[in-house]
Each structure stands twice: as C-alpha cells, then as structure tokens.
Amino acid sequence: MLEINLSPIYYRTGLNSPVPFPGLPANASAYAHQLQTYCAVTRTRNYPQVSTWCQTCELAQTCPVAQLQPLPQHGTLCITNSAVTGGGKTLAAYAYGVQHCLTGDKVLGVYPTNELLHDQKRAICQLFQTIHKRPPTEGIDGELLVVDGEFLRQEKDAGEQNIKLIEYILKRAKIVLTNPDILYLLCHHLYASSRELTGRTITAFSILIRDFRTIIFDEFHLYNSKQQAAVLWLVGLSAQLFSTVETPHPHSFIFSSATPLTEPEFAEKLAALNALGVSTVTIQQPGEFQGRPVMEAVKLRLESANLRAWQGEEKAIEFLPELQTVLHQNPHHRCLYVMDAVAAARRLKQELTQLFNPEDVGEAHGFVRPEEKRQALRKRHTTGTSGIEVGIDFTGDYFKDILLFEARTSAQFLQRLGRIGRNGREGGENIAIAIVPPEVLNCLLEYPQLPQPFDRTHLPMLIEYGFRYFNPEGFVGYLEHYAPLEAEYTSQIYLKGFEYGKNPVSGEWEETQERRLTRNQLNQLIQTLYPGHNRQTARQALRKLLANGTISGILGFRDGGGVVEANIYRAIGGKRENGKPLNADFSPLFNLEIPYFDYAKSQQAQTFPFHRYSLTYLLRRTHCRFITQAEFLDYLQPYNHYPETPTYLKQLAQANPMNYAIVYGDLPKPRRWHFHTNSGQYRWVKQGIKQKRDYPILDKVRRISGLSIELEKTEAALDIDILNQALEKRDAIAYIGKGNAFRYAIETHLPPLFELCPFRWGASEAQYYLAFDLNAFFLSSLDSINPACII
C-alpha cells in the first residue's frame, strides 16, 4: 500500500487583461488559458483588435497566442488546450463560438462518448444562458442540437435517409454537438448510397465546412490512430478544398485535452499541413499555488492486484466494508466505482446493495440503457466502466467525493482520478483508492521518499514512470498503412459530385477545370499527410481491399462495417471480370452486437428489459440462451405500448442482428469458449490453380466464412446451435495470428479490453487468435513489412 496526499491545484484569477471574456458569473474572472484560447479564436476573425489587447495584457510576454501571425482569409488555426482536468476547458473552447453563434459563426462540438455528449450539453446551455440572458432553443429547428444515433432514429421519418436530415440540421442549427462516428460518416461520404445521396452528402459536408467555423474536439487524448487520421483529413480539407471558396473567416479547430498531446506522429502530420495554410498553437496552464482551486486535495491510496488475471474485482470487494465504515462516520460522502469490465461493475453493484440501501445504488455502463445511466449517476453509489470516466463532471446532481477504481495504464489512472475533486472547494474531503498492477506499486514504493503533501502537478510524471512498462500500443502504423486508403476512398466519392463538360471544339466529354483543380488538391493533400503515397498508389491498394471484401473493416467502426458495407459498394461502383458487382458473392458481415431480453429486469415493474450488447461478453460472463428472431419478437410483443419500443425496433431494423438472446443473470466464473472453423482457405498459386490449405493464412486481414462457436464444456441450455446456424450465414473481416490470445495481448501491450478472441482450426489443437474489423487492421499495422504485403 502507498498513500499520497495530493495538494490542490490553483489557477490565478484577477489577471490584468483587457480581453472581454464572456460567459463568466458575476465577480468572477477568467483563467489564463481561457483568455488565451478566446484570443486565439478572435485573432482569426479580427487580428487588429486582438493585437491591441496584447499591448496591455500581463500575459503577452509569455503568451504563445501573441506570437501568431495574421491568417489568410482561408487559413486554418489548430489550437491545443491542455489545461488540467476541471480547469474550465469547456468554457475556454466555447466562449467565442457561443457568443457569436447567433450572428453566423456556428459551432460544432465532437465528443468521444454519448454520455459525455449529453453531460456537456448542460454546461453549454448554462454558458448560452449567461451570455444571451435566455436558454437556447432546442430540437430539430432549434439553436442547440445534440445529434447522435438515437436522435437520428427518433427524428427520421419512415423511408427518409439520415443524410437528408443531417443536411437540414446543418442549415438551421447554431450549435451542434455530435460524436466522432457521425462526423466520420459525413466527412467520408459513407451516407452516400446513390447518385442523389452522393450529391446530398457532398452538399451537407460543404455546409459543415462553410458555416461551422469553430470545430471543437473534446477529450482528444482518447482518440485512437484511426480517429486521429480522420481529424487530420478534415483539417486538411478545410484548408485545401475551400481555399477558393468565399467564406467570411478562417477555421478554428480546438483540441481540448487534459493530457498534453504526446503522439509525435499526429503532431508531425499536423505540422506538415503548414504548407497548406494550417497554423498551430499550444496552450498549457499546469497549475499554481494560489487563486481558485480547480482540483481539490485528494487522499490517494494505491493498492495492488493482478489485473491481467482480472483480480481487481475481488480486491475492490475487499474494500467495501472499509468504505461502509467511512460512510457511517461521514454520511455526506458519495461514492464512484470505475472498473474495467462490465461484469466487475455489475458484481460490485450487487455487493453494494447488500451493504447499503438498494435505492442508493446505480450502475452506468454498456449493459444498461442510456436513461438508466443518467439516473444511476445521481445515486449515492454509482458503479461503471470506461464510459463514465470520460469528461463527465461529477458535480451538482452527480457529485462524488470517494473514488474506487482500477488502472491498467497511466492514462487510465490519471483520467479516472480526475473524476473527483472538481467542485472548487477549499478543504474538500476527497478519497481515492486505486487498484494497480503489483509491478507499478512496487516501483513507486522504491521511489525516493515522496513529500507530503505531494504537488499534484508532478503526479503525471510519477504515474507515467510507474506504468512505463504498461503503456498500451498506439497502432501508429495505421496512419501510414491504411489512413491513405480512407483518404483515397473519400476523394473518389467527392469527385463524383463534379460533372464532366463537353468540349465545344472537339465535341468530346472532358474533365472540367473545377474537377481538375479539386483532383489536384486532393492528391496534394494525400502527399502532404502521407509522404510516399499519392492517389495512384492509394487507389491500387484500395482496389485490393474492395476486391477481397475487407474495405468496410477500415471504413466501419464499433459494430463493424456491416451497416455501411452496402453503401460503400453502391457508391464506389465497379464490377469484376465476369460482370458481377464487386460484392455480389459476399455474405452479410458479422455484427457482434446481440439484442437480448433481460429476464431479471422483466420481473421489475415499469422497466423495459431489452438491450443490445457484445456477443463475446454474453458468451463469457452471462447465463444466457440464444433464440430465434420470432421468439425474441414474441417476448417483445407485450411491451409494444412502452415508449421505448419504437426506438428499439428502429435499432433492430438498422443493425440487422445475426442472433438474439435471453440473459438470466451473471455467471460466477467466466465461461470458456472459442471460435472454430473446418473451412479451408484458398489462395492462388503461380500456376493459377486454387490450392486448399489445412491451416489458416496468418498475419493477414481476410474475409472469412464458416466460423462457429465451440464450448469447452457442453451446455445444452445455451442453445449454441441456434447461434452457429446464424454464424454460418455470415462473413467476417478478420486477422488470424498463431499463439495464445492472452499471452499475445500482454506481449504486444494491446490496449485494455482490446477484443481478441481464441480460435481453433479443424481438428488441430494449435492455438490461434482472431481480431475482427477495425481491430484486425490495427493488428495488421503492427507488422513492419511492405504495406502491399499487408493488404
């Protein structure tokens, strides 16, 4: 055990600055990073005005914003704000945009989780109220709109396409909050499935870039390499494609992150865009010893458990009687429990209901519905997983001051610790218990004696040192191997929006000057971001992925590429030598999200016991039974009058699930199972004759079929045959490697909860592992070989 008393972090107030920062309560003043971010955005709109502010501002001598040169009308400024957690980054990012959104300067906010999306809406509404003295109008025709998958399903009329709705929203709303998935679908034209919708997609994207001059990416340090590539492409497009379009102001991209962006690959590529008119500025404010407390004092305790063997759950349960005593002595405390696994969070909830009033205990994770999560966050005890660690402010109704959490990496540790102590109190009593790997605790115990209290501004360096052998793989190879292919696909679809013209002299149909200019701009952007690539090399690689049926693995996300695959092939066109469409012989893809009926919840009055969750989790951790669609709909029929039912039916129709289940409860111990196939894989040999292999093609991304599930112990009640019948009708985009999945994950430092499944081939006892969809390409990007061989 190691105890550390963390000192508060303060930010100075009352700075001598003429900057008219908006949105502050009476008798309050802005922090340095807030003034600097506001000035940076204002500089892109009114450079002379900001220059006069610098003349009398006490920050001017050391302020990075003061060094910025004027941007051209079509320039782009990228602002990175790395102020500490709880330091007011949301206010800094949105102050200018909310102040001017009613006069044509629209704002787009992008959040990595839907929980954070709805949580931050509260803060932005408060800011709007403070600035404009009234709340923003909300809804489809309002000034502020949250656009996620649930909203699109609710608002879309029967038969209407999402892109039509998005186009309508972008024209009317002043502030739009969304998630990276919807932005990715829009910017990569994946809503396009016909000539009409291709045109609408391009129009919607053009409206986005033309009208939304401030684009904010919150919690940017959580973005993986694919998401970073998408952001780089968007920044490049804003500077390149719209350099000749009449727009009133340059763009401002704000990357808000409590952790300084240390990924050199992203920073290098962002710097490379300087050649296209993109400027960058980094704003940091680490903390001071006087002013307003932005992070309160915390009594931190580190305990160890073998997290690789999932022993954090048992360790957390050991601490519950101790917490019960603390809460008995101090009834005002409220507790948050953040675990890695859903099963651990559910088990913890069950244990807590034995010690405390069950009405005071809630769970917020992927196994419960969104409205139930929001209710759970208000309870005295809230258990959850990674979804609640991302930027949610546990203040106000969500207030918590005791935290028990697991941490497998330094980023997890710092992110989760930052959930409490954000209320600006002097003398607040905050307690945090961190369960870390034994190696980390032993390393920190050997560290020279730590001063007490410990300066919290030095904590990141200490924690990163302790976790230095546990830092997860970042898959930076994806940026070089596969991001250029995403860019090429987008370029091809975008160019479909430009007509060919008839030469009045020759009478031949030729490329118009506008299309030629756009084509050259796209090629220059790909070459700038990805040296060594151009549209020709990327096109050749893209054709391979289209032909072998794996393209939706990189253009899809989360649930896989099954939802967008049909759109991809309809939009890109192309046929094989036999005249068939490229995807004519493909079966539908796996969708590992399974709709299920929660039997235990159905016994509770006024609850809607239907949800969706990962097939691999249901197999591993639940007492369940697989059923047919007809049986599932029979269970759903008595709930037809519930308000949740129409939305749930829309989700089912869109997802095209491959199977259904009933969940009766949690298993006391994980079930052991693996994927299996007897199907041979084929490849062409030099003589042009197909040759059957009795072992899988390893270390490649392939489209495979014939997968089934095998259990190590037979369970007739599971009805696994129903599941396997559905699997037989599906294809999967997969990467197959040889070896033990658990050992490989440790050796390669895969991120926590990276989905890697055990796999068997035929009658062989050899161990293999599978990764599906985007994860398959992530593993492929680890191979330091010729990219052409990877594909």
PLM feature spans:
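N-terminal helicase ATP-binding lobe
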Residues: M1-I791
